[in-house]
């Protein structure tokens, strides 16, 4: 299966993979032995790992996101005609109290919890669960993993830092797609100074923090993501081996293949130069290889697109969809991303 190639490639190079991680972390012989062979029923289920997303409540309205994943997007979505005013803004688990009760019953068994959203650090249910775990004396036995936008570490009466200090492990995968003004455009409502301040606070106050960045690469941030990675390593916000890059496929108007051939060629050159820079870093080879593979997979994706690319200029990269969104939000994409000045369609600015 083609989708499995990334894990196999990592393992062929002697590195860990998500496949290997799950097979190693969640291999419980007693579960296999207790499972009924006829209906796969487990009479005394003990949950070790939970992946939970309580709702779509979020403080950001990222360009490539939608109201289904962020409540902050709802107003723009209605104005643009993407959502009906009658549709619910908040999409959440139907009976949160019942779910929490079921999770509370499993606290003595849980080893790891993955929180995503929405934005998990602004969900009251998330804080209720952490406090319950602490009250039961289980925090030192449980690792927490987050996908968070790093916009804030506090919400209402809660501050996540003193809670995290009590848990066994804290792994953060920061959803950051760009830096400075580009980052603020891509993840609307975020303030870059706050992001850096939050990272620095965590480094000081949560010493067992495992901090990673997990950018989603679209054509818009395709140049800047390299600068983001290098800046974060040079500022010691991350170490080598701490980038988990995802290639955007949807919404399709933001996919990498929308770029003209000239830009795709330039990106291959930029990424290859960045890979050479990674090789010079003072870090273990296995960690450097992880970062190299993260960028090499983008190069491969671009080259595959170049093979079938027909540059007839009929297909616009900066679409009317994006132009309408920028007008609504009163931002000028080309002022923030001058590297794409050649893509500007004056018709959209009349």
Place the predicted regions along the sequence by residue:
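Alpha-helical packing segments of well-folded alpha/beta enzyme cores
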Residues: 1-3, 50, 99-102, 129, ...
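N-terminal pre-core extensions flanking Radical SAM catalytic domains
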Residues: 1-90, 106-107, 291-350
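Generic marker of residues within folded, mature protein domains
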Residues: 42-44, 136, 203
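Core AdoMet radical
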Residues: 47-57, 68-95, 108-124, 136-156, ...
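Leucine-rich repeat
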Residues: 100-106, 131-137, 161-165
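Distinct, well-ordered alpha-helical segments
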Residues: 127-131, 155-162, 224-228
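Conserved C-terminal portion of the radical SAM core fold
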Residues: 143, 167-173, 192-348
């Amino acid at each position: 299966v083609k989708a499995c190639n990334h894990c196999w490639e990592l393992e062929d190079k002697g590195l860990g993979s998500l496949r290997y991680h799950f097979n190693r972390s969640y291999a419980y012989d007693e579960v296999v032995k207790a499972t009924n062979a006829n209906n796969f029923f487990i009479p005394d289920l003990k949950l070790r790992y939970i992946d939970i997303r309580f709702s779509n409540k979020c403080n950001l309205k990222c360009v490539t996101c939608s109201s289904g994943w962020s409540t902050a997007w709802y107003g723009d979505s209605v104005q643009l005609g993407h959502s009906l005013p009658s549709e619910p803004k908040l999409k959440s688990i139907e009976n949160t109290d019942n779910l929490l009760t079921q999770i509370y019953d499993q606290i003595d068994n849980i080893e790891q919890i993955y929180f995503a959203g929405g934005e998990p650090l602004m969900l009251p249910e998330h804080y209720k669960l952490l406090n319950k775990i602490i009250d039961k004396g289980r925090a030192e036995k449980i690792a927490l993993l987050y996908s968070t936008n790093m916009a804030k570490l506090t919400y209402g009466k809660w501050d996540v830092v003193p809670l995290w200090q009590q848990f066994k492990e804290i792994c953060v995968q920061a959803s950051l797609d760009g830096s400075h003004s580009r980052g603020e455009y891509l993840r609307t409502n975020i303030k870059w100074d706050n992001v850096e301040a939050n990272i620095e606070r965590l480094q000081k106050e949560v010493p067992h923090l495992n901090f990673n960045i997990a950018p989603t690469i679209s054509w818009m941030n395709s140049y800047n993501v390299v600068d983001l990675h290098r800046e974060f390593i040079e500022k010691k916000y991350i170490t080598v081996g701490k980038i988990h890059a995802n290639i955007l496929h949807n919404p399709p108007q933001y996919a990498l293949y929308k770029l003209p051939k000239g830009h795709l060629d330039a990106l291959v050159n930029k990424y290859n130069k960045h890979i050479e820079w990674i090789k010079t870093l003072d870090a273990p080879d296995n960690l450097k290889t992880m970062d190299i593979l993260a960028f090499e997979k983008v190069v491969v994706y671009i080259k595959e697109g170049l093979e079938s690319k027909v540059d007839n200029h009929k297909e616009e990269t900066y679409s009317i969809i994006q132009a309408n969104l920028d007008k609504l939000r009163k931002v000028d994409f080309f002022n923030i991303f001058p590297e794409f000045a050649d893509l500007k369609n004056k018709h959209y600015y009349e």
